Amino acid sequence: MAQAVVPAMQCQVGAVRARPAAAAAAAGGRVWGVRRTGRGTSGFRVMAVSTETTGVVTRMEQLLNMDTTPFTDKIIAEYIWVGGTGIDLRSKSRTISKPVEDPSELPKWNYDGSSTGQAPGEDSEVILYPQAIFKDPFRGGNNILVMCDTYTPAGEPIPTNKRNRAAQVFSDPKVVSQVPWFGIEQEYTLLQRDVNWPLGWPVGGYPGPQGPYYCAVGSDKSFGRDISDAHYKACLYAGINISGTNGEVMPGQWEYQVGPSVGIEAGDHIWISRYILERITEQAGVVLTLDPKPIQGDWNGAGCHTNYSTKSMREDGGFEVIKKAILNLSLRHDLHISAYGEGNERRLTGLHETASIDNFSWGVANRGCSIRVGRDTEAKGKGYLEDRRPASNMDPYVVTALLAETTILWEPTLEAEVLAAKKLALKV
């Protein structure tokens, strides 16, 4: 279990079994009647273990994990939004009179935008519009996490609201007809809180060279597995379409995959999965960073590789459609790079399984290219492409919408298309 030391107690986070009644009673605590079936079930628990004040902490644990469903129809909704930096997440809670199934059943809300860098002090109110609902793995029961986007009181999206523009792209009839699928590989790095140095690294020093750590097992090679596993289970409970996890090449770095997701859902699921990860690392006393190159030198950076396909790409003859998409992406390389995350120039150097930020390239099974096509896709003549350029701190609404726009809605001039095809050795 991941542990964070706090005054007079330790906090553990993870998926744990309920404490037996006898053990709880022996500790001086009370066993709450919690339903174990249906939507009210939560396998994700916050557990506080006392070193000095056992009775007090046991009661705290019970309150944190208490399922209120048998006692009230009211639920807690955690409203979540993207903050002023465009990468930070904010949230606050409110009571809703009864369980809800759709975001349209939830009220709009507001917050102080001057405290998040999203509005001036003299006109600070920013309005939250509920857009997607997920089950709350921290509170359990019928409680929910709510992904919101942000608007002025007049109903205009504020500059950091990238979801609004993405929703417009994904509602375009041409895009809808192509049913765009996204599979996003979110990499992240765990840091020791007081020193901001990767988990498992000696303070002020370095571990052995890369090689033994990717998908590794063992206490000398894998650092943070408890956090990765707790996050995996919490995402499954929440209803996020998480499809896998693995330890990464750099020690202390991990990856999880979300998808395939259709359209705007991809962005919603990545943002909520990031929120859940932030909450878990908060409880574990570990710092989460999405910096694309947290450690300079001969160490891998952190990306957010985005696998993408359209209906036409997935059908027979789809490889030709993929090649046309690659051609379009090459012609808008600079636009995509500018939208693919802050600090990406430190990562896209042409080393450590990346392409150069300055040059567009593509290849089959080549992880040193901007766009990779899998051998399976080449062999079958249909499938998907992988855009390896996005940084770990990218906005998934921006990246997914831009991929759809460039490959479905945007048409280059014939002259530009011919020149690009010749340069990339693409026959389209």
From Swiss-Prot:
Cellular localization per UniProt: Plastid, Chloroplast
Entry keyword set: ATP-binding, Chloroplast, Ligase, Nucleotide-binding, Plastid, Transit peptide
Boundaries of every GS beta-grasp domain copy: 75-155
Enzyme class label: ligase
GO cellular component: chloroplast; cytoplasm; mitochondrion
Plastid keyword on record: yes
Family matches, as PROSITE patterns: GLNA_1, GLNA_ATP, GS_BETA_GRASP, GS_CATALYTIC
Catalyzed reactions: L-glutamate + NH4(+) + ATP = L-glutamine + ADP + phosphate + H(+)
Gene3D superfamilies reported in the protein's UniProt record: Glutamine synthetase, N-terminal domain, Glutamine synthetase/guanido kinase, catalytic domain
Cysteines engaged in disulfide bonds, as pairs: none
UniProt xrefs under InterPro entries: Gln_synt_N (IPR008147), Gln_synt_N_sf (IPR036651), Gln_synth/guanido_kin_cat_dom (IPR014746), Gln_synth_cat_dom (IPR008146), Gln_synth_gly_rich_site (IPR027303), Gln_synth_N_conserv_site (IPR027302), Glutamine_Synthetase (IPR050292)
Pfam entry (one): Gln-synt_N
EC number of the protein: 6.3.1.2
Molecular function via GO: ATP binding; glutamine synthetase activity; mRNA binding
UniProt domain GS catalytic: residue ranges: 159-428
GO terms, biological process: glutamine biosynthetic process; response to cadmium ion
Signal peptide (from-to): none
Region feature (Disordered): 95-120
Subunit annotation: Homooctamer.
Purpose of the protein: Light-modulated chloroplastic glutamine synthetase, encoded by a nuclear gene and expressed primarily in leaves, and which is responsible for the reassimilation of the ammonia generated by photorespiration.
Extra remark: Plants overexpressing GLN2 show enhanced photorespiration capacity.
Protein family per UniProt: Belongs to the glutamine synthetase family.
Name of this protein: Glutamine synthetase, chloroplastic
Species per Swiss-Prot/TrEMBL record: Oryza sativa subsp. japonica (Rice)
Upper lineage: Eukaryota, Viridiplantae, Streptophyta, Embryophyta, Tracheophyta
